[in-house]
Amino acid sequence: MIRKQEITTFEFPEKAVIWDVRDSSAYAEGHVKGAVSRPINDLNADILNQVAADQPIYILCGGGSKAPRAAEKLEGLDASREYVVLMGGTRAARDAGLPLEQGA
């Protein structure tokens, strides 16, 4: 199941699995605190299986175009999971003053 949530109004659960699907250089320039780099082209069943099946996966990108595509790709691998697309991406998070981190 894919659902959408505005990143600016979203409250991250304490142990959230947050995947930033931009390329690694864009991720290193700045990403939402707690997000891990999972470039869209690298998403596969092996990576997906590293996350507990009942754990929602929160997906974001730079501005909101790659994350929905990544969610569709993941849903194609396992439709029983919950995928949450964080709309607006890193750009909206930065503009809203949410904490960002730099580096890999």
Model region roles, listed by residue range:
Residues M1-V17, V21-P56, S65-A104:
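Rhodanese-like catalytic fold shared by cysteine-dependent sulfurtransferases
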Residues L60-C61:
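Short, surface-exposed ligand- or partner-binding patches at beta-edge/loop junctions that are enriched
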